């Protein structure tokens, strides 16, 4: 076959690859036991696929890390990241911040505890902050295998004092797993500050277009990489080559997109604070945010992310609920209600119907701010608020 000098890695949809001879087949399968990131010979797409490896290298460049393992969803990334530390009866306890993605908390309750019978502990925030005296007490008492947290919580956008958390956990020899979906490698690279693994729901900002589902685990330790590749291979947590190819094109605009997300969110949060229909705006870039100092210390002048949470004014639970619903209805054709985030288009999500008893706040809405023209966004949202 004639060699084609393509400027981009092609889309390889093959389920398996031609090994050509028995000798080469034996060598390929022997080498496969090493679970290298990029094999000399590709065998089967559930093991490794060249299109996927190319996208992984792009993420490695963004994270400034030695390896990245792409999977089909963010939840698959979480499964791999925590499961590679499990060793049957010798599995040690683990400690999770409670202010993490709701799906992760369900995974903890319904998989790690209910089905795997693991010893899992949680650390709770108090009044929008993390109590480090309590965190150290738990680390000392539990002696966990790892500590799992998010740099920016969802939906209250609590920014963690991550360097202090990592330093404290290291004193107790706990590994560090960070879900940095909200922060992204644009704002913070956890591995450079001592984290052992960083995970992302690639579905969100890294992809940014709402048309693929994917997750990724990143690290520097080669043994953890081999464990992650083996777990992905044996559980089938593999991203499709088509999605990996699409992701590869989307990653090229990631930094440009995310800067615009940050710029728009800061401008919109400032705008919302001045609206008489709004009771509270939560955005880490605002002086009113309880963890603005932590956000500035962590992110510097790069931005504060693309998420805003705000609460409408109201005289009662029912009044707030009705105003929330009118606001959502007024934007139905322009800013849709979609339970995801990080897309180029602005989308919204009501808090109480999703988080329930954890956040029984009927007037509260989460905005995933897109990269549209900011003046148009202000006009749309201002017009909806004027109908309250």
Where are these predicted regions, by residue range?
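Residue-level signature of catalytic and energy-coupling elements of molecular machines
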Residues: 150, 327, 367
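Conserved N-terminal alpha-helix of the aminotransferase class I/II PLP-enzyme fold
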Residues: 16, 21-76, 80-84, 103-111
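Acyl-CoA thioester-binding alpha/beta core of soluble enzymes
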Residues: 1-35, 53, 69, 86, ...
């Amino acid at each position: 076959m004639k060699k084609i000098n393509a400027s981009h890695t092609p889309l390889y949809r093959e389920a398996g690859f031609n090994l050509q001879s028995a000798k080469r087949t034996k060598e390929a399968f022997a080498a496969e036991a090493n679970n290298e990131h990029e094999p000399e010979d590709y065998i089967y797409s559930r093991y490794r696929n060249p299109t996927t490896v190319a996208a992984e290298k792009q993420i490695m460049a963004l994270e400034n890390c030695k390896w990245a393992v792409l999977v089909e969803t963010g939840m698959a990334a979480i499964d791999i990241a925590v499961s590679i530390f499990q060793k049957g009866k010798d599995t040690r306890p683990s400690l999770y911040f409670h202010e993490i993605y709701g799906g992760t908390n369900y995974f903890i309750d319904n998989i790690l505890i209910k089905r795997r019978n693991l010893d899992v502990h949680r650390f709770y925030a108090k009044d929008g902050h993390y109590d480090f005296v309590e965190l150290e007490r738990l680390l000392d008492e539990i002696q966990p295998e790892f500590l799992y947290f998010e740099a920016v919580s969802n939906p209250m956008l609590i920014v963690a004092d991550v360097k202090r958390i990592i330093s404290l956990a290291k004193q107790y020899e706990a590994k560090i797993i960070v879900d940095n979906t909200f922060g992204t490698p644009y704002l913070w690279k956890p591995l450079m500050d001592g984290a052992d693994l960083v995970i992302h729901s690639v579905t969100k900002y890294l992809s940014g277009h709402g048309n693929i589902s994917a997750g990724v685990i990143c690290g520097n330790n080669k043994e953890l990489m081999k464990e992650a590749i083996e777990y992905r291979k044996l559980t089938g947590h593999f991203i499709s080559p088509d999605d990996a190819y699409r992701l590869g094109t989307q990653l090229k605009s990631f930094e440009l997109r995310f800067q615009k997300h940050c710029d728009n969110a800061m401008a919109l949060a400032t705008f919302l604070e001045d609206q008489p229909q709004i009771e509270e705006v939560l955005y880490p870039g605002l002086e009113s945010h309880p963890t603005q100092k932590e956000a500035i210390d962590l992110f510097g002048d790069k931005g504060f992310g693309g998420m805003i949470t705000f609460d409408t004014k109201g005289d009662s639970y029912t009044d707030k609920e009705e105003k929330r619903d009118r606001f959502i209805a007024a934007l139905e054709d322009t800013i849709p209600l979609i339970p995801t985030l990080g897309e180029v288009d602005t989308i919204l999500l009501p808090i109480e119907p999703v988080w329930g008893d954890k956040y029984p706040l009927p007037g509260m809405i989460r905005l995933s701010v897109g990269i549209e023209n900011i003046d148009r966004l202000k006009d749309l949202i201002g017009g909806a608020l004027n109908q309250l």
